[in-house]
Amino acid sequence: MSNVGQQLLSGGLSGLATTVCLQPFDLLKTRLQQGDGSTWRPTRPHTSIILDITRDVIHSGGWRGLWRGTTPSLVRNVPGVALYMTSLTQLRALMATSPYFASLRRRPQNGDANKNTSSVLPKLTSQGNLIAGATTRVGVGFLLNPFSVLKARFESNIYAYESLTGAFGTIVRQGPSELLRGFLASSLRDAPYAGLFVVFYEGIKHEASYVLPPVTSTQATLIHGLSAASAGAIATMATHPFDVIKTKIQVRTEAQYHGFLTTIATIWKQRGITGYFDGASLRMSRKVLSSAIGWAVYEGGLMLMRTST
């Protein structure tokens, strides 16, 4: 199998694993963010609100209700993650041929011969990783935005969609602008998120490989998982307000949620600064876990396939 084929397969497996395992986090986050907070007491803890939403979901749809929207999530995430990780790896490999972005960072020490076993990915400077992550994420996000809209609306309880094809047909009939709804907010969230994630992931992984030399595949997988979880936590908190804005635009139908700036103003008027962090704990939990699972599966899969060929 070619390198690109290996990357697509590993990326697809990564997307499948994270989506199936963590869909309840996504659904609860969407339900929490879709509201305007008018039914919540200002001092009410988020944990209590999340528990109420969870009970409502289980009451109306049983435990399976927590996995509502899994199909559109898979439709978006499996090819999306495969395309993103493959494109990111290919772009980084291309950028690594440039003296402006190729990483020269190296810390020689005893056992240095094993240092490359922690990763099979191209090495770039921090600036290169930032640009590669942001550029790739926005490009893939543009292609898959229609599925993001579909996923958000399927997870929401505002729309009574009975089938995936029926939901997609309704969105298509509403016009091209509906297919790209929320793309600006998504880009403002995803570009810095992906850029920061790759920078911190590679940086933490580089340093961790000297604390725990990845002599075995198990140690390498542990480094990948912990590095990705840490990077995911940092990048998530830095970009969460744009996630709230994106969800409002894609799910709410009122006029005040049709534009990026008007949505920002509406959230501020109704909730203040706290409104921009609705669902932050859920997104943080999901991103930390999905980053750890996703990148451990991706890099581990690549290392396994390359050592077996």
From Swiss-Prot:
Keywords from UniProt, A to Z, are:
Membrane, Mitochondrion, Mitochondrion inner membrane, Repeat, Transmembrane, Transmembrane helix, Transport
Chief site of localization: mitochondrion
Q: Tell me the SUPFAM superfamilies matching this sequence.
A: Mitochondrial carrier
Residues that span the membrane, as ranges? 8-33, 69-95, 130-155, 182-205, 223-249, 279-297
| Keyword presence, Repeat | yes
Annotated Gene Ontology MF terms? Answer: glycine transmembrane transporter activity
Pfam families in the cross-refs: Mito_carr
User: GO cellular component annotations, sorted alphabetically?
Assistant: mitochondrial inner membrane
List, alphabetically, the InterPro entries matched: Hem25/SLC25A38, Mit_carrier, Mitochondrial_sb/sol_carrier, Mt_carrier_dom_sf
**Membrane topology, as annotated:** Multi-pass membrane protein
Check the record and name the Gene3D superfamilies matching this protein: Mitochondrial carrier domain
Q: Which compartment or compartments is the protein found in? A: Mitochondrion inner membrane
From its record, what is one biological process in GO terms? glycine import into mitochondrion
Q: Start-end of the Solcar repeats?
A: 2-94, 124-207, 219-304
| Reactions mediated catalytically | glycine(in) = glycine(out)
Q: Keyword Transmembrane on this protein?
A: yes
Q: What PANTHER family does this protein map onto?
A: MITOCHONDRIAL GLYCINE TRANSPORTER (PTHR46181:SF3)
| Family per similarity comment | Belongs to the mitochondrial carrier (TC 2.A.29) family. SLC25A38 subfamily.
Query: What is the role of the protein in this entry?
Result: Mitochondrial glycine transporter that imports glycine into the mitochondrial matrix. Plays an important role in providing glycine for the first enzymatic step in heme biosynthesis, the condensation of glycine with succinyl-CoA to produce 5-aminolevulinate (ALA) in the mitochondrial matrix.
Q: What is this protein called?
A: Mitochondrial glycine transporter
The species this protein belongs to is Laccaria bicolor (strain S238N-H82 / ATCC MYA-4686) (Bicoloured deceiver)
